[in-house]
Amino acid sequence: MDPGRPVHYEGVFQNRAYEDSISDMESQMYAPPERVEAYLRDNPRKPFILCEYMHDMGNSLGGLKSYMDLLDRYEMYQGGYIWDFIDQALFVRDEVTGREVLRYGGDFDDRPSDYEFSGNGILFADRTPKPALQEVRYYYGQHET
């Protein structure tokens, strides 16, 4: 293992027994901004990362500003990772039209299936931007890395 790379383990949030040896950062999924801020106000020893946040399924990416505002106020807040970045789908030839189309989930008549649950990115599977990307671009563009 490369000792120079930070280690991330989201499970430390659920079990603090090994937090000093198992993870170099505090990490949670989908923590509301208020919970993130409570951690950051309490003299944290480790930076905070949202390993998943802003799940973009349907029209659900709203609320990004609340998280981005924390970047301006807390140095130990490192931001987060949007789930998902790109839809997960496959190009297949449509049996009726003969055209290449994107299919996912229940499109293959497989069971069990989460149907469109793999279609939750800020880009379509063909890398075409979705409207939610406009909000991400707007707020991310206001912050330096």
Q: PLM features: what roles do these ranges have?
A:
Residues M1-D126, P131:
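Substrate-binding/catalytic cleft of secreted carbohydrate-active enzymes
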